[in-house]
Amino acid sequence: MPISHDVRQYSEEYDRLKLGIPTSSNFHKIITPHGKRSRQWREYACLLIAERILQRKIEFYRSPAMERGVIVEAEAADWYEFDQDVTVQPIGFITDDAHTVECSPDRLVGDDGLLEIKAPLPHTQVDYWLSGAVNERFWPQLQGQLYVSQRRWVDLLCWHDVLPKIVMRVEPDAAFIKALDRELQSFNFLYRACHGKDPRYQRGAGPPRTIGIEGGVPSEPGDCPVTANPIIARRHSPDPLSGEDRAGHF
């Protein structure tokens, strides 16, 4: 069941509660728009593991379009509310009940919808306007928002203060969401295993085994490319979250 967290986006509390959790805005690092495993899968998993161990958010470059999106979000949401004759509501973020995945839509729309706002550069806005279609690079994020929130649709608003504005509705894609669910299950298993949350990977749970890794990520959910290494698996340090000794920290 989806759980809404009513905190201000980008606040200190927002970052703390989201720490180390796969987020829909980064689902493209887990799954491609075509439903295949992303080549960024392992790198993203290691990033989240590092965040959990360090207990701080790891900052990255934010493009001008991303910065602009934050600045114009309120104005764009007001325009959408008037243009579509709907009521929108701010939201911090939404997680599943196990707190293993999350999404941060820009607004809730009524009881069934979401709003995601993009503020692209002018030439990109024109490209979206001419194509009249959702750019595939947004597909994992939008489908991920529907997967986590269990809402019926999400409106993608590509907003510019002068150029034509575009609103495109996206509904759940059953085949893609099935593939997304599969990849998220594997991804979260790796996270728990390598962070010492799965009892099979705790110290004393048996000797490490040698496994084959396809493309640098586990071939199956039970294959952890960190703890399966006999040298790495023998190293351990206290878990900063529980105070217990766990295998797999290095």
Name these PLM-found stretches.
Residues 10, 27, 44, 60, ...:
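Phenylalanine-focused residue identity feature
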Residues 41, 79, 107, 129, ...:
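A residue-identity detector for tryptophan
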